[in-house]
Structure formats: structure tokens, C-alpha cells
Amino acid sequence: MELTSLKLVNYRNYANLELDFSPGVNVFLGENAQGKTNLLESIYVLALARSHRTSSDKDLINWTAKETTISGRIKKNISETPLSLHFSSKGKKARVNHLEQSKLSQYVGQLNVILFAPEDLELVKGAPSVRRRFIDMEFGQMNPLYLYNITQYRRILKDRNAYLKRLQLKQTKDTVFLDVLTDQLVSVGAEVILARQLFVRRLQAAAQPIHAEVSNQREQLTLVYQTSIDFEEHADLEQIKATFAATLNRQRTREVMQGSTVVGPHRDDLQFIVNENDVAVFGSQGQQRTTALAIKLAEIDLMAQETGEYPILLLDDVLSELDASRQTHLLLAIQDKVQTFITAPSLSDVARQLIHTPKVFHVKQGEITLEAKHTSEK
């Protein structure tokens, strides 16, 4: 998979930008606050129809404008497909081959991306919500059914919480509608839990050999999906549904008192264990970074297995956060097989040695130029 071109209109600090990319490594060099991260964010948004930096689409629109458009062309095998996203006060519109998509779940997955940024080093020790979002965004790209189910789960959860709040405030005493919402939550939530368990097992299988190699065979990585519902490890879908329903029934009084749903996939977590120790609690900074690196590299292989093509990789100012050894493992792993976009103030000696014939852009105050050996492009 390859992103051959990108066009931005009124996107953050870019009023009008068109770029053509190398199928190999594309490097964007510049000082901080010049627009490098905005550029990589736009590629991420083009793929997933949402930003990793803000929950408000309005933040993506240039402050002088009322709407923004991101468009690009992706190449799979020998065919090219145009993609575009339009954001305005009326919402977002997604198009594939110039045809508007009725659901975003039909759009997401056309372009698959893996983002590795400094905040991803928080994947191991950050809040559980960081790890849930990681699972949802990465697995959602690979599996449209999972993306649909997690979207439905969030909608039902929002409705159920709103009704629990009404019960808490004694605005209603009728629990029949709560029963309906509970049944819906259990049905979709069990699908989400089962799918997440499968994803975590496959991610572990891909990450373990990478982690062992980066740690020079000194450490073994294990991933544990921690659910807020106490069911047997190898429970099937119907068993998960039954346990989820029983747990919600036991928690109903507490839920009404709190006005919110206290158990379910929205409360689950992912634990990283190295040599039988929780890396978030007992791991050194080096172990935490090795774990995060192994997970990101495993994602690339897993997505290639699932979709039949390698995703594109976005490295946003992350090389400077890795020591020479981890930089080497990362760059060798992606060498000549993954289209990569790198932002950095400057390239390290390791990167210059290992990156073959990169296409280098310089970014300054929202203006982008190619290095002298290329034709200038803005």
C-alpha cells in the first residue's frame, strides 16, 4: 500500500498544499511548531477520518476558513484510488473513488496507517483509555465488523448512561427501557470483548519474537487482556453474554446510584508483562520503550497478514526518543518494505546510514520545499 499524493485545503496552518511522495521513505525536517506534525496528522485523518490529537474536527480547520478538505491517492498493487474527506460545521463527508460513503465504517480501512509518536511511549504506562483506544483504532482498520461493533457499543453505552442518570435523578422510575438497553449492550459488548481477545492473542504472537530480539533474548513479553467482567479465560460468545448480563444485573443498584455503566469493554485494559513483571509498574524506562517499539513493529506485520498489504508508517518526532540500538531495530525492520513518513528536527547518524534514498522535504512556517536535488514543490 502506498500514498502517492496528498492535497490539503485550509487544513490547520496549510491553506493550500499539494505533495507527491516516494514509495520508500519521506522525511520532513524542520524546527518545532512549523507544521510537521500537522502534515502527518492529515495523513492519519485521511486514513481514519479522525485525529489522534483532538476530538473536535473543528480544530482541523484553518482559523481563517469554515471548512477543510484532505484528499489523496492510494496505490494498491497496480491500481490507484482517490480518497477525500471534507470537514465543515455540517459534519464530515468521506469519498472513495469520488463516491460519497454513507457510513464511515465503509471508508476506514481503505488506507491503513501505523502511527508511532512520542506519546505512544505512554502506551505501556499511560491510562487504560490509551490502551483501549489503541486496540480500537488499530484493530478497527483491519476488521470492519469490529469497527462497526465498537461504534454501536459506544452509542448504546451513551444512551444507557443517559437513562441511568435519569433514574439517579428520579426523573423516571420505569426500568423497562433500561432492560432493553442492557440487552443491546450485552449483545454488542460480548462481540467486542471476544474480538479484542483474539486481537491481543495475535498481537502477542507477532510481538514476542520482536521483543526478544530487541532485548537480546533476555526478556519475554506477554500481553494480558484484562476485562471488568469475570468469565472463564476461553469462554465462547454465549458464555460471555451470560456473564456480562449477570454482572450488570448484580451492579444495577450501584449503577443507578452512580448514574453510569460500571462494567463492560469501556472499562477494560491491556497489560504488558515482561519476565512475569508488569512493565507499567516495575519496568525501567528502557523496558517500557522496548515494549512499545515491539508492539508497533508487530502491528505492521499483523496488519500485513490481515489485509494482504503493508500499512504506511508515520514516525512523528519519535526517532529522537529512541537510543541508537532501538532506532536500528526500527529502521531495519521497515527497510525497503513499508512506505514511511518521518518528521524530525534533523536526522541522526543512524537514520542517515539506514534510510535508503529518502525524499527529503524542509518545513518552515507552513511552507514545504524539497531538498535541492529535487524540483521545488510547495
From Swiss-Prot:
An annotated GO cellular component: cytoplasm
Keywords: ATP-binding, Cytoplasm, DNA damage, DNA repair, DNA replication, DNA-binding, Nucleotide-binding, SOS response
Keyword ATP-binding: yes
Transport recorded as keyword: no
Annotated positions binding ATP: 30-37
PROSITE patterns in alphabetical order: RECF_1 (PS00617), RECF_2 (PS00618)
Primary localization class, coarse: cytoplasm
SUPFAM superfamilies in the record: P-loop containing nucleoside triphosphate hydrolases
One of the Pfam families matching this protein, by short name: SMC_N
Localisation: Cytoplasm
Domain of life of the native organism: Bacteria
InterPro entries: DNA-binding_RecF, DNA-binding_RecF_CS, P-loop_NTPase, RecF/RecN/SMC_N, RecF_2
GO molecular function terms listed in the Swiss-Prot or TrEMBL record: ATP binding; single-stranded DNA binding
Family that this chain belongs to: Belongs to the RecF family.
Protein name: DNA replication and repair protein RecF
Lineage: Bacteria, Bacillati, Bacillota, Bacilli, Lactobacillales
